[in-house]
Amino acid sequence: MKRVFSYLYPFRYRMALGFLIKVLGTVAELLLPVVLTHILKTVVASEDLTQVLLWGALMLLFAGLACLFNIVANRMAATVGKRFSKALRRDLFYKTLTLDTAQTDAFTIPSLESRITTDTYHVHNFVMMIQRMGIRAPILLIGGVVITLLMDKALALVMIAVMPLIFVLVYTLSRLGIRLYGRVQTSVDSLVRVLREDYGGIRVIKALSKEKYEQDRFEIANQRLSKNEQSASFIMSSTHPIMNLLMNSGIAAVTALAAVRVAKDASDPETVVAFMQYFTLISMALMAVSRMFVMFSKCSASARRISEVLSTPAEIVKTKEATSTSDDFITVKNLSFSYAGKKRDLDNISISIPYGSSFGIIGGTGSGKSTLIKLLLRFYDADSGEILFRGKSIRSYTREEIAPFVGVAHQKDFLYAASVEENVRFGRNISREEVWEALTLAQAEDFVRALPDGLDTVLATGGTNLSGGQRQRLLIARAVAGTPPLLILDDASSALDYKTDAALRAALRKIGDKMTTVTVAQRASSVMSCDKILVLDDGRAVGYGTHAELLESCPIYREISDSQMGGALFE
């Protein structure tokens, strides 16, 4: 909570001024019954029309001031709330971009989305409520009680006797609500995850006719959310009816006592009228307090979830440069890594990738190919062993320092709802000519020129208005744009036909002196021309050498080659 509400500090003076204006408006509102009592007791009895008009005008003035001050204060509160939530969402989003990959995996993408949207919305609503009613309600409550005590202690004490019951009710339910709304937000995360998976894989779902299966998955998540929402709503919705019961009981008791006191001349009707007005104001204040506690329950759960992200320390940090050095672009020594800390996903891998060379990584599904690439990009740090990047330990670099040297195209990278040029440039200072050069190298020039607006053609989100091969070629163009020193193609040509794949490899060989290339593939044809090839199986290196050497020494590589291209081709 403290971390989240520290974002209000820059607005403290505006909030203080807003609170002051709100105090003035509330005081003006509290004075209305006092003026009314004076009119009923004194002015009406005097039968002086001028006095009636003057005191009536004074009531209108107080009412107008109360309205004006509240409007101004509420507008100031809206400005603070808008700027507060904007800054909070911005920093939360920036933090999600800098989370380590393992931390992102731990939070999950749907949960992070929910925290940026739903949770910040709950906190925003509470900040707005606390500015609008956080001062007004206590002043109405305390001021009303003080004035009623001065007017008629006996009636006031009856009213005050109800308040402890109300406060106990609100406090108990709000504490319970924090836990219940925490469960609701967790259920929202689960539902969002199912939605993301279903919408992202809608083509696969339709192709395999798995609509019923996904409906069942959604129904389970939806029922869990509904159950938790029902529990939270049932508890929190009980607040207002029970409060109304207590307040109405208090009003009934006050009315009965007032009738007795008026009959005995211990009080007068004018005082009772004013007293009932104050009782109404106090009731409104108590209802506002109850609403604030309900919103606090949601806000507290949401603020805790937001703080978890904002307070997460970076695990992958720049460390003091190690003494090991290398003349190669990348050197991997005895590298081991595990996602879950149990079974090793990579086990004792050692490779060398010289400057200007081409390096291939091949293996079956789950062999550790993409995991090795993630370690080379420092998405994760290895459990043991060492990676040297440009002659120095990779731990001596931040990810931001590695990024300018690397162009990466993954198999399932994302294309944005922007023009082709913007997708290839991706925020970098790259000329239009360089964009065309990248498209030509990626074998994408012809189809881009054939698009209705060429480079200015706007793509659908995810590039869904392109074929799979066209999307991959644009992703490769993005990776090679600007000629980065290291190009990593992580199964990035899997959707290309053999002819286009061969043309791409030929184009990359022509600029081999400008870039070091790492190609991850399941096709032997995609890596056969590489200077060195690493064969992975279940996280272990089972082959390392040239294409010809591996055909002789590595049964797994030979099996892949034979199954894909025919053994006679290589004999």
Q: Where are the regions a protein language model picked out?
A:
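Transmembrane helix-loop-helix hairpins at lipid-water interfaces of multipass membrane proteins
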Residues: 15-72, 76, 149-154, 265-269
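Hydrophobic alpha-helical transmembrane segments of ABC transporter permease domains
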Residues: 20, 24, 28-32, 69, ...
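A short amphipathic helical element positioned immediately N-terminal to and/or at the very start
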Residues: 1-10, 112
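ABC transporter TMD-NBD coupling linker
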Residues: 199-203, 279-341, 381-384, 388, ...
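ABC-type nucleotide-binding domain
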Residues: 325-571
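Helix-loop-helix
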Residues: 47-53, 147-164, 231-305, 309-310
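An intracellular "coupling" helix at the cytosolic face of ABC transporter transmembrane type-1 domains
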Residues: 9-13, 77, 98-102, 118-131, ...
